[in-house]
Each structure stands twice: as C-alpha cells, then as structure tokens.
Amino acid sequence: MLKEILLGNAEKGIITQIYGPPGVGKTNICIINSINAVNSGKVIYIDTEGGLSIERIKQIASNNYKIVLENMIIYNAFDFYEQDKIIQKELPLITNNASLIVVDNITSLYRLELSDEANKNIMLNKMLGNQVKTLLKLAKTNNLAVIITNQVRETVNGFEASGGRLLEYWSKCIVRLEKLNGDRLAILEKHLHAGEERVKFRIVERGIEIID
C-alpha cells in the first residue's frame, strides 16, 4: 500500500494526507502521482507555497512532460481565502473528468491567518474543515484520488501534523515522512485496510527510488 502511494498510485475515493518537515519529499510524491494520474484523467493541482517546479515535472516525466502539463490544471493560491474559493467554488465545476486533486500544502496559508482572535480562529477552523469535506465529497462522487500535504509542528516527542484531529479525521490514509541519514523514511500511520508500514526511499533525478 505505502509503496503504491510513493510510486504514484494513491487510492481513489479517499483523502491521502502526506505530512513531514520541509524538504522531505512531499511535493515529489505529489508530482509522481500527478504524472501517473494523467493516464486516466485531468490532474488539478493547487500550489499554496510556490513549491511546484515545472522543471522538476520535466525531470521526472522525461519525454512525456508535454502530455503531463497539457493535462494538469494548476492553481496558485496566495492566501487562505483564495484557497477556499478554489476548493469550494471552482473545483466542483471542473472535476468531472479529473483523476486526481492535489492540495500542496493545505495548512500553510491557514496558519498564516491564525491570530490571537478566538472568533477569527474558530472561523478559520470551520473553513478548513469545510474545504476537506468538499474534497472528500469530490473524491467519492467522481471516484478520484485526493492528496493533501501538511506541515508539522514541534512536540515534546518530536513533531506531529498540523491541523490536529480535524485533518486526521477526514484523511482515511495518512503518511508521515522523516529524514533518515540522507535518505527518507515513509510511515503509513493510518489506513482503513492496512496496518503500519515503513518504507525507506531516496529522492533521485527521475523521482523516487525505493530502498529495499
């Protein structure tokens, strides 16, 4: 199950959450899944951090990069309210022929809006929850895959995903990424039909290489 996600076959009909510190490979996994998904439909990619590199898509897709880019709809969201508009208003209109939706990163703009104002934070939490519910509805209605990436926050024992129980509840598959002596470790923390799995991998020019 975990290897399938890393190599571009995220499960349809559910939300897969991938979280970890910066530079651990979240966007690479999203790109690999996008390249694979264009074989069965459009890919809708919402980039909230400017991390999606066309050059990286060309590297991984190689000779097929033009076909990949022609079948990707890329949104750049610059604030949390724009992200909300894209997910709530625009996605439902264009997902009929889609095979994958990516939101990379779903919490970065949300965290920028958080403040000391309790009422504002309650509103932001509600907006985030409604976004994720909409994504799940689209996944189920259109039988497509949804991948959301997430930031981390430090805890006493290391780090945990941002967004708390809200994102944990709606994500039926959760993958944690860690750096491991120059390589990477992926941990399947949650899945409806699978127990915990661990896979070592490294990021290479053509994508990801699984380490046996």
UniProtKB/Swiss-Prot annotation:
Q: Would the keyword DNA damage turn up in this protein's UniProt record?
A: yes
The cross-references to InterPro entries, in alphabetical order and at most eight, read: AAA+_ATPase, DNA_recomb/repair_Rad51_C, DNA_repair_and_recomb_RadB, P-loop_NTPase, RecA_ATP-bd
Q: Which GO terms describe its biological process?
A: DNA recombination; DNA repair
Listed binding positions for ATP are 20-27
Highest taxon of source = Archaea
Cite the PROSITE patterns for this sequence: RECA_2 (PS50162)
- Cystine pairs annotated here are none
Q: Which keywords has UniProt assigned to this entry?
A: ATP-binding, DNA damage, DNA recombination, DNA-binding, Nucleotide-binding
Q: Which GO terms describe its molecular function?
A: ATP binding; ATP hydrolysis activity; ATP-dependent DNA damage sensor activity; damaged DNA binding
Family the UniProt entry places it in: Belongs to the eukaryotic RecA-like protein family. RadB subfamily.
- Explain the purpose of this protein: Involved in DNA repair and in homologous recombination. May regulate the cleavage reactions of the branch-structured DNA. Has a very weak ATPase activity that is not stimulated by DNA. Binds DNA but does not promote DNA strands exchange.
Task: Tell me the HAMAP family matching this sequence.
Answer: RadB
Under what name is this protein listed? Answer: DNA repair and recombination protein RadB
Gene from which this protein is expressed = radB
